[in-house]
């Protein structure tokens, strides 16, 4: 019995080993098709607000970091099986996700919005979209909102592996609306040639039940050391001006949101 107990204790200690170590890279998972937060440059390099923030955090923490690309709905499974050590991919902090992973403090917070053709009216999304199609990023907070609120109201919710795919189907006429983070939709769609003739409609979506407490960095359950290092680095970037420097590269407003 003592041997079994010892083996059990050893197994538990292995499972709960912290990720953070100065002599090995921190593997950060990201879905690289969510501009302006994450995207690929023409030469195949990762770029965007999330990438710049992540690189600055790693520099502040004095650790080497390795970006690992993954479809959004595969990020948490990859974290849980230790293919990656953290997720920095515009992932909103929600109670549902906190049952699977731990989060740092937020590093930004923006509302979700609907986009439809210019001139469309959307006073009541559930009533006005009944019998129509709305596109969402699979596994996102918009997906959660749409599943709980739109599907029961008779809206056909169509899920995509990237927001860009949803936007393209809107332009192609296969969708009546898309719903996602407002900044992503503005910079990644409305300000592009493809987004001409489309506009925000309806209310800002901020219900914490669906849209959480802001966007944070996810780590494995119990990895308080890595989460603590990230939190300290976020605070440092906010204090030393580097956060604002990165923010101003992409946005004309305070993307961090109210404290």
UniProtKB/Swiss-Prot annotation:
List the InterPro entries hit by this protein, alphabetically. Answer: Lys_Arg_Orn-bd, SBP_3_CS, Solute-binding_3/MltF_N
Disruption-associated phenotype:
Deletion of the aotJQMOP genes greatly reduces arginine and ornithine uptake. Disruption mutant has a reduced capacity to use arginine and ornithine as sole carbon source for growth.
| UniProt key word Signal | yes
Pfam families with a match to the protein in the record: SBP_bac_3
Origin species:
Pseudomonas aeruginosa (strain ATCC 15692 / DSM 22644 / CIP 104116 / JCM 14847 / LMG 12228 / 1C / PRS 101 / PAO1)
Q: Show the GO cellular component annotation of the record.
A: extracellular space; outer membrane-bounded periplasmic space
What PROSITE patterns does the database record attribute to this sequence?
SBP_BACTERIAL_3
Similarity-based family:
Belongs to the bacterial solute-binding protein 3 family.
Q: Predominant location of this chain?
A: periplasm
Q: Which CDD domains has this protein been placed in?
A: PBP2_HisJ_LAO
Q: What is this protein called?
A: L-arginine-binding protein
The molecular function GO annotations come to: amino acid binding
Q: What induces or represses expression of this protein, per its UniProt record?
A: Part of the aot operon that encodes proteins involved in the uptake of arginine and ornithine. Expression of the aot operon is strongly induced by arginine, via the HTH-type transcriptional regulator ArgR.
Q: Where in the cell is it found?
A: Periplasm
Give the GO biological process terms.
amino acid transport
- Signal peptide position in this chain? 1-21
Q: What does this protein do?
A: Binds L-arginine with high affinity. Shows no measurable affinity for L-ornithine.
Arranged from A to Z, the UniProt key words for this protein are:
Amino-acid transport, Periplasm, Signal, Transport
